Amino acid sequence: MNEKRWRKEPGARVEGFRDLDRSKVQAPGIARDPSGGFRLFYTGVGPGRPFPTCQGYILSAVSDDGLSFRPEPGIRLAPQPGVPHMGLRTLSPTVAPCEEGCWRMYFESRGPASLPTVICSAISTDMLHWKHEDGIRLQGFDGLGGPRYVVLPDGRARLFCCAEERGSD
């Protein structure tokens, strides 16, 4: 059997030290930058959040080698308080190139606890400035989250997510 084994490398790739990410850094998703290197998108939480009830937003960092990352200033994607399903947090980004030469980010989103988590998307031409796309991409599952966009060997792609199945027991 041809088995691959993963080995954890020493050191953190991104550490929270700014007001935007001092409290939490989690759920990274990486994309190759067409101009070279890599851009890591991740969830951040800290005292510099965009509004008092915000529970998470998406930040980014760049790297030439995929090991040493430099955080970029600002928030890439923040919750939208006026949109019920996106009012409190945007988490767990995954980024994919589009045929039109732009980029699409899929992410977990949440409003108040009375609404379930959903998967939404945003679009960008430069991977720095993102525009929320209207609507919900995926919904209807308990505990939905953690989207990951994966290109298959034949060129098709799939969007994988986590979800809980709650039985009647």
For each feature predicted by the language model, list its residue ranges.
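Beta-rich carbohydrate-recognition and catalytic domains
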Residues: 1-88, 92, 96-146, 150-169
